[in-house]
Amino acid sequence: MLEGIIRESIGKKGTKALRRDGYLIANIYGKGLQNLHAAFKENEYIRTVRNKETLSFPIKVDSKEMNVVVQAYEAHPVTGKLLHVDLMVAQPNVVTHYHVPVVTEGDAIGLKNKGLIHISKPRLRVKATIENTPNSIVVDVTKMDVGDAKMVRDIAKIANVTFTDADRVSVLSVIKAK
């Protein structure tokens, strides 16, 4: 379980001091809940997020335990180092928006014809309860050749889950390698 601290000072000076000490700044919020200004050790946070098996993961801040989902993050434009993360509390039986990762399944025909799979939308926005939200959206690419694309409307519907991205948005395509 990822453990964090409550930030006493939310100003620029306090934020810089926490970052210098190796902390990642986080805001934790949820429907009907008080916002929490927290900080986590950056290395522990990255290890937890990379190794999680579900969309939500447990955290402990100020003796409060909760399951959260990463809603947004901010990275430094040059170094790519994480600066800030927004975590939403995954409340049971509350319908809200989540960003679910897209995973490909199979080998595309186009890969044998000197093509590459280009995932233009690595996460799809869905509206559902946390219990009904899948951990990932699997897209079968076995019949895709160079020039083919899968759009949101081509993805199989999931029970009690609504895709909020437009139907005409391209999720992935097989492009010709240069």
Curated annotation (Swiss-Prot):
Name under which the protein is recorded: Large ribosomal subunit protein bL25
Record organism: Sulfurimonas denitrificans (strain ATCC 33889 / DSM 1251)
Single GO biological process annotation from the record: translation
The organism's taxonomic lineage, starting at the top: Bacteria, Pseudomonadati, Campylobacterota, Epsilonproteobacteria, Campylobacterales
Function: This is one of the proteins that binds to the 5S RNA in the ribosome where it forms part of the central protuberance.
The keyword RNA-binding is annotated on this UniProt entry: yes
Keyword RNA-binding in annotation: yes
InterPro entries, alphabetized: Rbsml_bL25/Gln-tRNA_synth_N (IPR020056), Ribosomal_bL25/Gln-tRNA_synth (IPR011035), Ribosomal_bL25_b-dom (IPR020057), Ribosomal_bL25_C (IPR037121), Ribosomal_bL25_long (IPR001021), Ribosomal_L25_dom (IPR029751), Ribosomal_uL5_bac-type (IPR020930)
Protein family (similarity comment): Belongs to the bacterial ribosomal protein bL25 family. CTC subfamily.
HAMAP family xref list: Ribosomal_bL25_CTC
UniProt-recorded Gene Ontology molecular function terms: 5S rRNA binding; structural constituent of ribosome
Subunit organization: Part of the 50S ribosomal subunit; part of the 5S rRNA/L5/L18/L25 subcomplex. Contacts the 5S rRNA. Binds to the 5S rRNA independently of L5 and L18.
